[in-house]
Amino acid sequence: MQTLTQGDWLMRSCLGVLATTTLWLAVFGAGSAHADVLRTGDDYGLLVGSAAAPVQLEIFCEPQCPHCAELESTYGDPIATGLASGRLAVTYRWLTFLDDKHHNDVSARVSNALFSAADPTTPAMAYQALVQDLYRHQSPDGPNNSDIAAMARESGVAAVVADRIAAGDYAVDAATLNEANGARLDEVNPADPGTPTVYDLKTNRVVDIQDPGWLDALSS
């Protein structure tokens, strides 16, 4: 029988730890918790997808904006395809200015729910599916929290996160959110600071979304 020295035991122990660590990284990735939806550094944008994706878009939306609904209706599925392929990431910047115009709190509630959905357990595809579903159900009174939670579950958001949405748990201050993202929108699109605005973070230019092929051109 071979006698192992203290050095042999140490070497085998180190190799075992290395093998275990390598396997863990292969399965779970280098981070302690991989998240497909993250808050941006200023805390008011939501990065959906990988920060390493070659196409990085910043999209300014208002939950009650009909033109934003048109954008998601036309381009939501191609955006989802880009997210799934890893070629595209979207930083959503939600605004709530239409609450004052319509004398309601729909945009504030929906934006709060969308920030609640930005959880480490939420896949990018689930978040994008929720965005599209919310715009499909756009209405003057808006969905209530239970309705939003049901859409979240159907989109693939974890049940515990959907429960927080249903309860209306606080996730973001709507007024501060609108102020911060409004200032950012004025910065990137001073000539026409409306919603939706799509901004290319790679070229630092506003995207002409009136061109039907804008997304294909960016993704090619």
Where are these regions (language model features)?
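Structural alpha/beta surface segment adjacent to cysteine/selenocysteine redox centers
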Residues: 69-146
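Alpha-helix capping and helix-coil boundary motifs
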Residues: 123, 142-147, 158, 210-214
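A short, hydrophobic/aromatic-rich structural module that often spans a beta strand
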Residues: 139-151, 169-172
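C-terminal cap of thioredoxin/glutaredoxin-like
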Residues: 153-220
